[in-house]
Amino acid sequence: MSNVDGLVEDGWERVADTFRANFKDGKDLGAACCVYVDGRAVVDLWGGLADRETNRPWERDTVALVASTTKGATAMCAHLLVQRGLLDLDAPVARYWPEFGAEGKEKLPVRYLLSHQAGLPVVDTPVTFEEACAWDPLVRALEAQKPLWTPGTEHLYHAMTYGFLVGEVIRRITGRSLGTFFAEEIARPLGLSAWIGLPEEIEPRVARIEAAPFPYKSMEDLVTDFAKLMGFDPAVAGTLVKDVYGPGSTFMKAGAVGGITEENMHSRAYRAAEFPAANMFTNAHSLARMYAATVSDVDGFRLLQPDTVAAMTVVQTDRTRMHGVPPVLLPYTKNLFRMSLGFWRATPPINPLLGPASFGHPGSGGSLGAADPESRVGFGYVPNLWAATLVDPRAIELTAAVRKCLG
């Protein structure tokens, strides 16, 4: 069994037991988990291997790629500007970014960028990986792109374009890149080990990502498991998996925008560039601390005020259909994607988070950052063994343990 180090305060042993069980059961290779309550860490654990090939242990300061968990940090940057009166979510994007108004987008409001309702999950203009790393070519492609649907009438996860859309608005307002703004306004004031655009000197601290073996004998087994989790008829689940997650779907194409592949995701070029939807490197302590600062003071620093949090966590997608899903299946998609202004909201049983009022963002591979305003909790989980399932049980089990400890 892997060694687990760190802090566990009295009353929080259930979280520690759940974390240790992930190693015992082979669910984790290396990982970290942290819980803040009222601005103070009550659980701060790490263990296992940061790199199996070299037998390097996961240390307190180890960081890892957290994929789409990055989107929560990017959303916080936007809401910090809203809080300062510098960004109006109901204003057209073109007010801040005039070139965006082409192809019928002149009235598209900023809020649709944050809620994945803009109709821009993909671009028609081919953009190479090298061009995406340079930023401007993908921004130009978004300016020239016509929305796939009338903005605000449908939604679909903007897997990669989200970061360029929100990041360019922030750049136009502040004159700083998203990664620089995040570093100066969030990471440094809170003392986080978190970067969107990884400095080369941090490379020795980065955990090596491994893909977990596919746990199913066939796609039919995956569908059966998904149906059981969601309470769906297997036929319904099979159609959803095919239409939403199948090869050639817009959802799958959205994840490949900018020439992103499994190979170049682990390159120095990708780590050094800014992909504000997908390439933050951080650890669980920093995720929990960052989210804690949205619901409480952390060492005298409060990132977002209660009225800002209340406004940014209103669900935006409940009244719109998921793009590409047949109408007969729409009732089944409501709990697949409940998005507020940049954050997932709790969607039991697939993503219960910390409770009904909680918000956060998961990432491919299993990472999660979340907060709960009612219990004033910040939560972070970061693994380096990336699960190959539609729903990762590790964060679900850890957040369930947090809820139990809260009573």
Where are these regions (language model features)?
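Flexible glycine/proline-enriched surface loops and loop-helix/loop-strand junctions
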Residues: 59, 145-152, 162-165, 267-276
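Active-site SXXK
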Residues: 16-20, 39, 63-90, 166-171, ...
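Short, conserved catalytic-motif segment at the N-terminal edge
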Residues: 5-66, 88, 144
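Short, gly/Ser/Thr-rich active-site loops of penicillin-recognizing serine hydrolases
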Residues: 296-299, 308, 313-328, 388-407
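Structured C-terminal helix/loop/strand segments within mature extracytoplasmic catalytic/sensor domains
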Residues: 361-407
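Active-site-proximal alpha-helical segments within enzyme catalytic domains
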Residues: 116, 162-169, 274, 278-300, ...
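Active-site helix/loop module of the DD-peptidase/beta-lactamase fold
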Residues: 60, 65-69, 83-125, 143-144, ...
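Active-site Gly/Thr loop motif
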Residues: 212-284, 314-374
